[in-house]
């Protein structure tokens, strides 16, 4: 009797196990949400707004590119690693890790071009104003063709230039190289990383770039930006569209100094990087910078370093805190 009961119990347990397993094999429809599709009027309004006077948003963005030292290009499934996944209302993107081109980074390049044409987002490359001895081909402006042309020596070889703070011509040639790079790569401007140059060298480069990107140059719509930490360069105010106060690391305290630069041209940044700990994904102090205004006038805008960290915002909304900062500075108009 005892064995019979054990056997019966075993049969019941087996039946239950089979029953549970049969339930697991039933297919359940998985709901996949499609991306929201906007009409042409939405994008037209977005582009028009970005061309209007307003406090801008700015990011340093590197997630589009492979890690430093790795070859090839990325074709990521996550929109957190796609340029096209950045917020529509974002104004300016500083391209960390290089410049995407059709040959080197086709996915990122297509995303960039789409964002430029449809969303009116502007992309600048990262120019170095921290070191000297850069080497590049010398070039000059050709009025006849309205383009740059390489300088050649008596043998017909292209002249190579190296930046030297004691030689003004090398700095002006470096500025022409930067402007030519912007035009050849289809970018919207250059952002010089000012972390070691002297004021005079930066002013020379700014003055030369202004010949091409300034109001009287052939491409006045292009941006000339300087980002700085510790001290902002003198002598560039008339040439510069924006001065970006850097934040490679999370800032302790609330930094609102301009370094003596015009308030309305100053963009205040914070870091969403790993050193910010839990504050990084939450957006650090970006909303505080969005809310803050000087006693008179207005700021140029606010921005973020390592904005890709905020893609996984605790709210579940990609770039949730950064989007909130955009709305604080420039509330959407609902009609």
What are the functions of these language-model segments?
Residues 52-285, 299, 303, 308, ...:
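Chitinase-like catalytic core of GlcNAc-active glycosidases
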């Amino acid at each position: 009797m005892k064995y019979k009961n054990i056997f019966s119990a075993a049969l019941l347990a087996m039946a239950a196990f089979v029953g549970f397993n049969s339930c697991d094999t039933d297919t359940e429809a998985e709901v996949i949400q499609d991306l929201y599709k906007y009409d042409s009027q939405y994008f037209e309004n977005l582009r028009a707004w970005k061309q209007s006077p307003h406090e801008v948003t700015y990011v340093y963005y590197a997630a589009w590119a492979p890690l430093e030292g790795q070859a090839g290009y990325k074709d990521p499934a996550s929109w957190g690693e796609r340029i096209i996944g950045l917020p529509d209302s974002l104004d300016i993107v500083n391209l960390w890790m290089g410049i995407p081109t059709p040959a080197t980074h086709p996915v990122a390049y297509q995303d960039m071009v789409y964002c430029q044409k449809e969303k009116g987002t502007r992309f600048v490359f990262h120019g170095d104003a921290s070191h000297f001895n850069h080497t590049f081909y010398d070039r000059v402006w050709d009025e006849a063709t309205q383009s740059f042309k390489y300088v050649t020596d008596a043998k017909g070889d292209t002249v190579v230039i190296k930046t030297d703070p004691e030689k003004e011509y090398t700095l002006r040639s470096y500025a022409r190289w930067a402007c030519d790079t912007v035009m050849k790569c289809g970018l919207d401007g250059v952002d010089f990383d000012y972390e070691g140059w002297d004021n005079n060298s930066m002013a020379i480069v700014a003055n030369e770039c202004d010949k091409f990107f300034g109001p009287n140059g052939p491409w006045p719509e292009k941006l000339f930006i300087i980002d700085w930490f510790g001290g902002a360069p003198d002598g560039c105010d008339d040439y510069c569209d924006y001065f970006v106060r850097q934040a490679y690391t999370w800032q302790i305290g609330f930094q609102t100094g301009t370094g003596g630069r015009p308030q309305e041209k100053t963009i205040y940044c914070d870091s969403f990087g790993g050193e910010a700990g839990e504050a990084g994904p939450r957006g650090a102090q970006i909303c505080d910078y969005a809310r803050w205004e000087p006693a008179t006038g207005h700021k140029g805008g606010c921005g973020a370093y390592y904005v890709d960290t905020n893609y996984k915002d605790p709210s579940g909304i990609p770039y949730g805190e950064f989007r909130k900062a955009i709305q604080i500075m420039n509330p959407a108009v609902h009609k």
